[in-house]
Amino acid sequence: MQTTKNQDDLVRIFKAILKEERFGSQSEIVAALQAEGFSNINQSKVSRMLSKFGAVRTRNAKQEMVYCLPAELGVPTAGSPLKNLVLDVDHNQAMIVVRTSPGAAQLIARLLDSIGKPEGILGTIAGDDTIFICPSSIQDIADTLETIKSLFNYAE
């Protein structure tokens, strides 16, 4: 067993361990990583990795609380280009809806609010991964939709 392994191996094995959905505490994850040869791993490092990869605690098939990676892909990072955070753009006769990666909606909404009325956006409401956009004019909603799509290089 090696005493140290590189960062890529650590990330790969960390994700594989979480996919097993059987570790209920950070100390159990530390022990599993140490058993895989990462002797310098500690609880603090595991805690940072859990945050970095968006791990959550949930119930597994045995109804035990365990750490796992969320099913959703595309958790935004500091280096994510904004266009990669927009997953879908759709509309009806009165409103435009933008779906984003989890956690990115408020960032994208702030950008849309900053371009505002000149581009046909009266205002936005953002949750975690969804933005409701109220156009300045319902008659011009198609133009506003195209502006938003072109801003994020979104093609259906």
Swiss-Prot record:
Disulfide bridges in this chain:
none
UniProt similarity note? Belongs to the ArgR family.
Q: Name one Pfam family in it.
A: Arg_repressor_C
Kindly provide the name given to this protein in its UniProt entry: Arginine repressor
Single Gene Ontology MF annotation: DNA binding
Top-rank taxon of the source lineage equals Bacteria
Q: Which NCBIfam families match?
A: argR_whole, PRK05066.1
- The primary location reported for this protein is cytoplasm
Cite a GO CC annotation: cytoplasm
Q: Which GO terms describe its biological process?
A: L-arginine biosynthetic process; protein complex oligomerization; regulation of arginine biosynthetic process
Q: In which pathway does it act?
A: Amino-acid biosynthesis; L-arginine biosynthesis [regulation]
UniProt function note: Regulates arginine biosynthesis genes.
Q: Alphabetically list the UniProt keywords.
A: Amino-acid biosynthesis, Arginine biosynthesis, Cytoplasm, DNA-binding, Repressor, Transcription, Transcription regulation
Localization terms from the record: Cytoplasm
Q: Supply the gene name.
A: argR
